[in-house]
């Protein structure tokens, strides 16, 4: 009997789609020209890079000249935050506002700036992981250079009130950046209508290859060059263009934003069924807001067990999942995201993240809700923490 395989970790990465792979292949063997070369092979490559730029721009409601290709979402975040910090420092503005539960690409960049003379204010989230725009308003100062708030959280899927936060920034005359790596393709985005000044995205979250990303920078914002060298990316990011990856990103984002409502209508009922069934397990809680969350995100904590053990057991049963973000899954520290919404360390350690797409069928859903309770029960039967809980003893 063939072993069942269910991939439920799309927030960590996604498979390259057949459509994207087919679009990329010619650029490895036949259309391999350097996009900076003036002969036809190079001109064709440059044309296709610009076509991909147009696709990314259209998907975001931006203009092509506002799109720059990068290697990943983390690079885009670094450029937006460090670039703005350098730009605004010349005007005496050395204060950044962000939240306590951003991706580490944002948090660690802010920590870097703190070590180099900048001040950072970390606004809180409520127990559902939502930011109050009024907290952002209170945090903004005369010397604030940038507000950077993620669009949707990578662990608990909470979707932030981006338009309201952007409106606060616009009112205060402060630039606003959002890490939308998890949001693109799952929610409708229009950077101009929403008042977003800068936005980061990553290809491998939307079925493009790893190692390609992009950043939207509103026209009129002139960030310092990210990489010095040749004139690629209008002189802002030197280095020979990764044409196959760029073309793939264009195809991927075009597909990702196609029929988002229809895709969500398929995924959300499956997500809700999993949540409803798993919450029947005693001493279990849903992390994040029930409604204001990404369509395929499920994050649940099971008291009395370790997330790592849960993942290993699920893997043996053919289910790929996560206990937090893949970037930190090797760490024994509890998720900073879960701690920020008020979970105790022991409860945060027992978290499970499932991130599903349309390819997780109704049959797969039934297997998931049949398997996980059995695994949780088995782990609890071996857990000294669970035993202490049942005796009413403190365990955290």
UniProtKB/Swiss-Prot annotation:
Q: What UniProt keywords apply to this chain's record, in alphabetical order?
A: 2Fe-2S, Cytoplasm, Iron, Iron-sulfur, Metal-binding, Pyridoxal phosphate, Transferase
Q: Where in the cell is it found?
A: Cytoplasm
What cofactors does this protein use?
Answer: pyridoxal 5'-phosphate
Give the GO molecular function terms. Answer: 2 iron, 2 sulfur cluster binding; cysteine desulfurase activity; metal ion binding; pyridoxal phosphate binding
What pathway does the UniProt record associate with this protein?
Answer: Cofactor biosynthesis; iron-sulfur cluster biosynthesis
Q: What pH dependence of activity is documented? A: Optimum pH is 8.3-8.6.
The top EC class is transferase
Q: Cytoplasm: is it a keyword of this entry?
A: yes
GO biological process per UniProt: [2Fe-2S] cluster assembly; amino acid metabolic process
Main localization, broad class = cytoplasm
* Listed PROSITE patterns: AA_TRANSFER_CLASS_5
Family per record: Belongs to the class-V pyridoxal-phosphate-dependent aminotransferase family. NifS/IscS subfamily.
The record's function comment reads: Functions as a sulfur delivery protein for Fe-S cluster synthesis onto IscU, an Fe-S scaffold assembly protein, as well as other S acceptor proteins. Catalyzes the removal of elemental sulfur atoms from cysteine to produce alanine.
Q: What is this protein called?
A: Cysteine desulfurase IscS
Q: What is the lineage of its organism?
A: Bacteria, Bacillati, Bacillota, Clostridia, Eubacteriales
Gene name in the database record: iscS
